[in-house]
């Protein structure tokens, strides 16, 4: 009996320590940098983007944002799941205010959890702070005398996505960035659609992983159908405020000409 009590005590302490570690991991503030050389950027100055997705219940850390600002991004893109059910409107707005301090345009696309929030309240916050919202549409973006396009696809899980509508006005000769919360958008893209960069989140990198095993793959970069892509682990968590083997992350993405 005494041995079993000791074992139970050891297991309890170990479980508590592991939970504390997972909680601390979930509160991390990591800024990853990526450089995508693209043929359409030849002869143009580099374009730098701060990309963040899956914020959920977190407040974006000010020191993290200061570090990101040091890269002088031209654009901020929120890849969906800015919030979820139960997140106070004041916290959502505070996160937007913190991003507004970059002093550059902010683009937002919807994630599945954003639909758990009162839509009129989200729109009110976006309108108050000049956030550009994309729902199956595209907008031009100019920097340093050059113009690119950003297309945003609405959430796939909520069956709100209309990819063809989002890209219908794109000029294949110019640089085109596609933003969709769910990386399953890769399946809808054709090689001749003129998409150069795809930014997504949603998966949280599995959020809780045991070695190579998790509900989703870790976030990553790569090439699919002639487009460079980034799938982010995301910044926040859902269900439980814990992470294991899938650190939270935000991103500085630099698009430049080939060497």
UniProtKB/Swiss-Prot annotation:
Domain of life: Bacteria
GO biological process, any: lipid A biosynthetic process
Residue stretches in coiled coil: none
Induction: Transcribed under partial control of SigM ECF sigma factor.
GO cellular component, one term: membrane
Gene Ontology terms for molecular function: ATP binding; UDP-2,3-diacylglucosamine hydrolase activity
UniProt keyword annotation of Ribonucleoprotein present: no
Cross-referenced Gene3D superfamilies: 3.60.21.10
Residues at which ATP binds: 214-221
Record-linked InterPro entries: Calcineurin-like_PHP_ApaH, Metallo-depent_PP-like, Metallophosphoesterase_sf
Signal sequence interval, chain numbering: 1-19
Keywords: ATP-binding, Nucleotide-binding, Signal
UniProt protein name: Uncharacterized protein YpbG
Organism (species): Bacillus subtilis (strain 168)
């Amino acid at each position: 009996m005494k041995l079993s009590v000791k074992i139970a005590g050891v297991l309890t302490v170990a479980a508590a320590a592991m939970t504390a570690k997972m909680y601390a991991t979930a509160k991390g503030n990591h800024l990853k940098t990526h450089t995508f050389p693209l043929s359409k950027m030849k002869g143009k100055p580099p374009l730098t983007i701060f990309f963040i997705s899956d914020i959920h219940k977190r407040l974006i850390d000010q020191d993290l944002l200061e570090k990101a600002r040091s890269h002088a991004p031209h654009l901020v893109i929120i890849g969906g799941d800015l919030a979820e059910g139960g997140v106070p409107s004041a916290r959502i707005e505070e996160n937007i205010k913190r991003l507004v301090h970059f002093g550059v345009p902010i683009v937002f696309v919807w994630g599945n959890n954003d639909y758990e929030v009162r839509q009129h309240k989200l729109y009110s916050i976006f309108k108050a702070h000049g956030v550009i919202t994309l729902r199956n549409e595209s907008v031009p973006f100019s920097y340093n005398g050059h113009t690119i396009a950003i297309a945003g696809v609405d959430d796939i899980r909520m069956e709100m996505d209309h990819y063809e509508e989002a890209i219908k006005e794109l000029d294949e000769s110019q640089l085109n960035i596609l933003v969709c919360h769910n990386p399953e958008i890769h399946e809808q893209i054709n090689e001749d659609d003129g998409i150069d960069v795809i930014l997504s989140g949603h998966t949280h990198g599995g959020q809780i992983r045991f070695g190579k095993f998790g509900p989703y793959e870790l976030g990553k970069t790569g090439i699919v159908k002639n487009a460079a892509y980034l799938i982010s682990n995301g910044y926040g968590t859902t269900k439980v405020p814990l992470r294991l083997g899938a650190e939270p992350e935000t991103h500085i993405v630099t698009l430049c000409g080939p060497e």
